[in-house]
């Protein structure tokens, strides 16, 4: 489908269109491919190596998590938090990689995903943690709903104050768009769910990532602002 869409676009605009596999575990290959294509092998190789090392490190550490200790997570999407995606979806790759248990027992939808669920279903799943997705133009919507609406207060995650907003600077760290920001998102979420196993200095990791990928030096204040609703200030 993606190839046919690319061909249609190419036919319409009359210039070459390239389709890239955006799977999280293949981000290193994406950078290597792009480096070859545009003649920036050295720079692409640096970014590819970072992606590969980061993913491999998380995968290996996640093997240490006992099944009974795995954290149950609900991914709250859409404008009200009543849309989500199940395990194995392209939209939940970060959660799957770090060893979280996706509580959403729903059919997998293609494309944009976003299966509609009811609050009653979420109450029956009763997750340990809720991750809220930030929609453009609705920056505080889902997080505010989940943390202030009395209907959500019955959930274990709400009672334990374990509702978090996924960072979204400059792109989402978890999903939509499936960018390289998911690489720092993996380290953030791994630390958040399993601090005894993943001992990343997330403040230092963030600064390193932004400098490497965006040529931007984050200040301590910017780091704290990004993490304000995403698990608190870094250690």
Model-derived features: where do they sit?
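Short, structured coil segments at secondary-structure junctions
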Residues: 12-13, 98-99, 159
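Alpha-helical, coiled-coil/dimerization segments enriched in small aliphatic residues
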Residues: 84-113
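Extracytoplasmic substrate-binding proteins
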Residues: 4-83, 114, 165-234
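Short, surface-exposed alpha-helical segments at coil->helix boundaries
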Residues: 3, 28, 85-92, 149
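Short beta-strand and adjacent tight-turn residues that come in two discontinuous sequence segments
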Residues: 19-20, 105, 132
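Alpha-helical scaffolding within the catalytic cores
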Residues: 3-4, 60, 114-121, 146-153
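Proline-aspartate-enriched helix->loop->beta-strand connector
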Residues: 1, 15, 118-135
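Active-site/pore-lining binding-face segments in mid-to-C-terminal subdomains
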Residues: 129-192
């Amino acid at each position: 489908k993606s190839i046919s869409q690319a061909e249609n676009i190419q036919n319409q605009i009359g210039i070459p269109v390239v389709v890239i596999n955006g799977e999280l575990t293949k981000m290193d290959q994406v950078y290597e491919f792009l480096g070859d294509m545009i003649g920036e092998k050295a720079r692409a190789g640096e970014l590819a190596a970072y992606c590969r090392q980061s993913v491999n490190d998380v995968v290996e550490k996640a093997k240490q998590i006992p099944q009974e200790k795995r954290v149950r997570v609900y991914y709250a999407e859409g404008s009200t938090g009543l849309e989500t995606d199940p395990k194995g979806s392209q939209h939940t790759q970060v959660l799957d990689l770090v060893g979280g248990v996706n509580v959403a027992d729903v059919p997998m939808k293609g494309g944009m995903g976003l299966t509609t669920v009811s609050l009653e279903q979420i109450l029956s799943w009763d997750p340990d943690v809720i991750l809220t997705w930030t929609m453009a133009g609705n920056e505080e919507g889902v997080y505010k709903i989940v943390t202030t609406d009395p209907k959500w207060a019955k959930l274990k995650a709400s009672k334990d104050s374990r509702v978090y907003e996924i960072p979204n600077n400059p792109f989402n760290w978890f999903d939509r768009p499936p960018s390289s920001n998911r690489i720092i998102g993996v380290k953030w979420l791994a630390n958040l769910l399993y601090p005894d196993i993943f001992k990343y200095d997330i403040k230092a990791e963030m600064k390193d990532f932004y400098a490497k990928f965006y040529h931007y030096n984050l200040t301590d204040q910017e780091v704290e602002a990004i993490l304000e609703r995403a698990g608190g200030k870094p250690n």
